[in-house]
Amino acid sequence: MLDDIRGPGDLQGLSKRELDLLADEIREFLIHKVAATGGHLGPNLGVVELSLALHRVFESPYDPIIFDTGHQAYVHKILTGRAGDFDTLRQKDGLSGYPSRAESEHDWVESSHASTALSYADGLAKAFELTGQRRRHVVAVVGDGAMTGGMCWEALNNIAAAEHRRIIIVVNDNGRSYAPTIGGLASHLAGLRLTPSYEKVLDESKKLLRGMPVVGPLAYALMHSLKVGVKDAVSPQVMFTDLGLKYVGPVDGHDEHAVEDALRRARGYGGPVIVHVITRKGMGYAPAEDDEAEQMHSTGIIDPKTGRAIKASAPGWTSVFSDALIDVASEHRNIVAITAAMPGPTGLSKFGERFPDRLFDVGIAEQHAVTSAAGLAMGGLHPVVAIYSTFLNRAFDQVMMDVALHRLPVTFVLDRAGITGSDGASHNGMWDLSILNVVPGMRVAAPRDASRLREELTEALAVDDGPTALRFPKGEVGEDIPAIERRDGVDILARPASGLHADVLLVAVGSFASTALATADRLGKQGIGVTVVDPRWVLPVPPHVVELAGQHRLVVTLEDSGVHGGAGSAVTAAMQDADVDIPSRDIGVPQQFLEHASRGQVLEELGLTDQHIARKITGWVAAMSREIGDSTVNPAAQQVD
C-alpha cells in the first residue's frame, strides 16, 4: 500500500482495516530503512498512527504541522511523498533526519532543538489572524520530553489567552510521565467538553446561577466542583485546563481511529485545544520495546532482525569521559553531575548508577540546568554539566551571569563539539569556543586524545575559583598522541625536521592534533619547517604559545570550530597584546550553517584535511617569501600533493 501514498490526499479514502495495514507496512519500512542508515528509530515507530491521523484530519501544508522535536517526523516525511528517498536518510545530499524547508512545503520549520514548536505555532496563528486567514489551523506535535522545556510553558501562557486562535497542541506522551486513563468515559467527556452547545449551556448557567441571591453562588460552586471533580477523576491534566486550555484525552495513540476522532473534535472547536496522546516509543519492534533505557531512540547501522549494531564500535569520547568522571568522583564526594534529559548520550548513565544521589536530570531545561549548577556550586559542591555543545547556546546568559559573574566552580563538558556530520546544521557544535571566548574567567580545554581527556577533566575539577569547560567531538577516540615535551602546560607534538627553519607554528586545537601532525609531515617534505603544539587549555591562550609564536615566521591555528571568535581569534589577540608582530592565520569552520553529511565528507568539503591545509599554508609561506625575497623556502613547496 505504501507505494500508492504520494501525498496526504491518498490517505483520505482508506478504510480502518487499510489504515491498520498501512501502519504495519510503515513500521516495517522504517525498521529496514533506518537499520541501513542509522537514525531516530524508536520515536518514529511510536508515532505511526498519530501521523496518519494528523494527515487525514488536517490539510497540510495549508494547516502547518510542526514537530517538536523534529526527529519524530520520519512518518510525516513518508506520508508527504518522500518514502523513495529514505535510502539517503542523513546522507550527503540526501534526506534530512529532521524537517527541512528545502525538502518539502509540508516542512514549515527546521525543528530539531526541543520545546520550540508551541512558540512557532503561536506566531503562525497570530500571523494567519492578522492576514485574514483565520480558518487555518496550526498543529504542534510536542513529544519526547519537550514539555519539560520552559519555552513550552511560556508559549502556553500566551496561547491560552487567545481563545479564538485555532491551535491544536498534540502532546505525544511516550514517557509515561503522567498517569493516563484511556477508555470510553474519557473519550465521552472529551467530546462533551468540546461541544459548542455544552459551552453555551455552561456559560448561560454561570450567569443565571451567579445572579440568584444566596443560593446562586453556592449552586454555581457546586456545579463547578462537580465538573472539576469528574474531570480530575478521569485525567490528571488539570494543569492545562487551569491555564484556560481545552483538554481532550488521554487517547490511545496506537488506535488510529481514536486519535483521528479526538483530532476532529479538537479541529471543530475553533480555539486552542490540547490533545493528549499516549504512545509507546519503539512500538511494534521487539528490540526497541525491550530496550528499557532508550527504546532505541537513536541507532547506528543495525541488523534489522536483532537490532544489534553491525559493526562493534571502538571506544568513543563519551565513554572515556564517563569512566573518567566516575574515577574522579569516587575520590571527591563534592562532585555532582547534571544532565538536561540526556544521561545516556552524554555519558552520565553509569555515573547515575554508581552515585544515584549525585546525578540530577532536570529535563529539557538547559537554562535551569546551568543556574541550578550555580546553586550547587554556591553550596560547596563542584557540578559537572554534561551537555551537547550545540545545546549550550540555549543557556548562554546563565553561563555568563549566573556562573561566571559569581566565579563559581562549574565544569561544562561539551560533547559533540565541532562537526557532528549526519545530524546537520542544528547539531554541529561549532559555536562553543566563540561563545565561551567572551565569558570572563572561563577556561576551556580541548583534549586531543583519551589520556588528555582524563588528565584535563581532573585538572578542571580541581579549579575552585571559576568555571571551566572541556570540549570533544562525536565518535571514536583515536590512538593517544604523545608529546615530545611539555612546557608551561603546552604540549610540543612536533618540531621542524633536521635542517629546516622554524617557519610555521601550527597550533592544534583538540582532536585536530592528528590532522596537524599529518599537515606538518606534508610541509616538511616540501622544505617548510613546522612546530606543532597542543595548548591543551585553549582559552585563555597559554603565554608559552605566544612566546613560541615570536620564534616563527607564521602562526596558524587549526580548529574544529567557527573561525569567528574562536581559538584562532584568541591566539591573534594574545599575540597583539604581547606585541608579537608575526602574521597569523586561522583555519576552521566557516561561519555558516552546514548541510548534513558524514563528518569526513563535511571536513573534505570545507578543506579541513591535511592535504588541503598543507596546500593553503604552502601558499601563505610562498607569498611571504616573495615579499621579502627569501630564498630559504624550497620553491617546490608552492605545490603540495
Curated annotation (Swiss-Prot):
Pathway annotation: Metabolic intermediate biosynthesis; 1-deoxy-D-xylulose 5-phosphate biosynthesis; 1-deoxy-D-xylulose 5-phosphate from D-glyceraldehyde 3-phosphate and pyruvate: step 1/1
Disulfide bonds: none
EC top class, as a word: transferase
One Gene Ontology molecular-function label: thiamine pyrophosphate binding
Biological-process GO terms, alphabetical: 1-deoxy-D-xylulose 5-phosphate biosynthetic process; isopentenyl diphosphate biosynthetic process, methylerythritol 4-phosphate pathway; terpenoid biosynthetic process; thiamine biosynthetic process
Cofactor remark from the record: Binds 1 Mg(2+) ion per subunit.
Cofactor(s) recorded in Swiss-Prot or TrEMBL: Mg(2+); thiamine diphosphate
CDD domains named among the record's database cross-references: TPP_DXS, TPP_PYR_DXS_TK_like
Binding-site residues, Mg(2+): 144, 174
Gene3D superfamilies (UniProt xref): 3.40.50.920, 3.40.50.970
CC terms in the record's Gene Ontology section: cytosol
Keywords: Isoprene biosynthesis, Magnesium, Metal-binding, Thiamine biosynthesis, Thiamine pyrophosphate, Transferase
Enzyme Commission code(s) on record: 2.2.1.7
Record family assignment: Belongs to the transketolase family. DXPS subfamily.
PANTHER family, per the entry: 1-D-DEOXYXYLULOSE 5-PHOSPHATE SYNTHASE-RELATED, 1-DEOXY-D-XYLULOSE-5-PHOSPHATE SYNTHASE, CHLOROPLASTIC
Subunit structure: Homodimer.
Record function comment: Catalyzes the acyloin condensation reaction between C atoms 2 and 3 of pyruvate and glyceraldehyde 3-phosphate to yield 1-deoxy-D-xylulose-5-phosphate (DXP).
Protein name in UniProt: 1-deoxy-D-xylulose-5-phosphate synthase
Classification lineage: Bacteria, Bacillati, Actinomycetota, Actinomycetes, Mycobacteriales
